[in-house]
């Protein structure tokens, strides 16, 4: 029987900014088709971990495997071929392009025809369909986050990385966005969401990972990490 390969395996990952080591042997996995929440207070090392996975920062040690491929410090095109797509904290949309142009921008990397991608996008994100000719820079913060997600999904990713999905958004918008994240997971896309505010992320995640000071301190189903998560936030992180 063939062993099931995880969407992501992080093994003994270390990273540094200059001479300051900020990740200390980080190890965890994202199973295929799962939504996983990477949690912890500000400065815990969550975004640094994400940047190592996304190829933005070269780790100083350890291993990153995406769908079974060893991809430490790989170029973005190689990561994309492995099925990885990242939505950074700043969302990465093009404000002077229309919603439609933003959605179409990455469709070259998809296996489906452009028309099918368009129909699928506006079915999943009807609010964007109503604004498809509008400049992306004129959308609300929540709509811009939806656009970033829609554009990422247009590439048919196997693994989606989300950084601070709720940053600067109203609670109702955050709730709507996480409902979409849950839907994405149910469609078979693996999702790793980095989040400082844990409650909403854990509502849709099958697995939660707690980080403090560059180390994983707890990992498990959301109900099983509650005490460690509380301790992480009460203790804080520099």
Model-identified regions with their sequence ranges:
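ABC-type ATPase nucleotide-binding domains, specifically the catalytic core motifs of the NBD
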Residues: 18, 74-76, 99-116, 124-129, ...
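The feature captures the beta-strand-to-loop junction immediately N-terminal to the Walker
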Residues: 39-41
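Helix-to-loop junction immediately C-terminal to a conserved catalytic motif
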Residues: 54
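Conserved ABC transporter NBD signature motif
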Residues: 62-71, 82, 114-116, 120-123, ...
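Conserved ABC ATPase signature
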Residues: 135-139, 143
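ABC ATPase C-loop
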Residues: 152-153
């Amino acid at each position: 029987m063939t062993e099931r390969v995880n969407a992501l395996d992080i093994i003994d990952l270390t990273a540094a900014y200059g001479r300051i080591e900020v990740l200390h042997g980080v190890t965890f996995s994202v199973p295929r088709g799962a939504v996983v929440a990477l949690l912890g207070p500000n400065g815990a090392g969550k975004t640094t971990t994400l940047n190592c996975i996304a190829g933005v920062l070269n780790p100083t040690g350890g291993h990153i495997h995406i769908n079974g491929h060893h991809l430490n410090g790989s170029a973005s095109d190689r990561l994309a071929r492995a099925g990885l797509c990242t939505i950074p904290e700043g969302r990465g949309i093009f404000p002077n392009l229309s919603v439609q142009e933003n959605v179409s921008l990455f469709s070259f990397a998809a296996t489906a025809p452009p028309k099918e991608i368009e129909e699928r996008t506006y079915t999943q994100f009807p609010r964007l369909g109503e604004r498809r000719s509008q400049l992306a820079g004129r959308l609300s913060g929540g709509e811009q986050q939806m656009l970033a997600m829609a554009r990422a999904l247009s590439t048919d990713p196997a693994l989606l990385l989300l950084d601070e999905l709720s940053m600067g958004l109203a609670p109702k918008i955050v709730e709507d966005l996480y409902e979409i994240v849950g839907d994405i997971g149910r469609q078979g896309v693996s999702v790793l969401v980095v989040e400082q505010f844990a409650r909403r992320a854990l509502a849709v995640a099958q697995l939660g990972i707690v980080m403090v000071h560059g180390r994983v301190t707890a990992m498990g189903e959301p109900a099983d990490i509650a005490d460690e998560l509380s301790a992480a936030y009460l203790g804080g992180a520099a």
